[in-house]
Amino acid sequence: MKLESVGILIGLRPMGERDSVARIFSRDFGVMCGVLRGAQTARVNRPLVGQIGAMSWNARLESQLGTFHWESARNMAAPIMMSGARLALLNSAIDLVTVLLPEREAYAHLYDETLNLLDALGTDNSGVAYLNWEIALLRDLGYALDLSHCSGCGARTNLNYLSPRTGRAVCDNCAAPYIGRLYKLPLTLDVTARFLDVVCADQGVTLPVSRRRLTV
């Protein structure tokens, strides 16, 4: 059995002295794991977390771990490594993908959003880009946030609150009786973290430490 796609290398774990078990977020097949031969000893084009490239995965049976062939096209993480704050955002995104996405289920839209995030993490727009990426992650996992209109009356102005139950915006008038129960807009990482906690609880996992360390 052979699968081919493009992907982002999001994890490497040593396997013996030469090989590694790689985790790749592919556009067509989602998160996949497999053995990457010679990953630890390669002197040219050494596999590194944060690379994007072409991958093929081979196994006799679909249930097997299988092996990867990986051709890196670009190391997206290189410009990020010099900034501790941007590196923290990268680590959080990788860990969230690893923990929350089921293996071998395609999330093509989120894959594209992740590529956009990797590009943006090397710029001054990294914080906003990361917040937008978390919103995309929540949406693709079935927890879409709707900030377009008030969930109570349909108003499109004065949307300064968010319902923790529905993830929908609430205008000032409708929010008045429930101020203490609502999240304040605009969105911050503190608010998206609360929704991510719900997702993690539903999946029986905990929010990654790298995500908990991010500041608001």
Set out the residue ranges of the language-model regions.
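Non-catalytic alpha-helical scaffolds and adjoining flexible linkers that form interface surfaces
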Residues: M1-V21, F25-V216
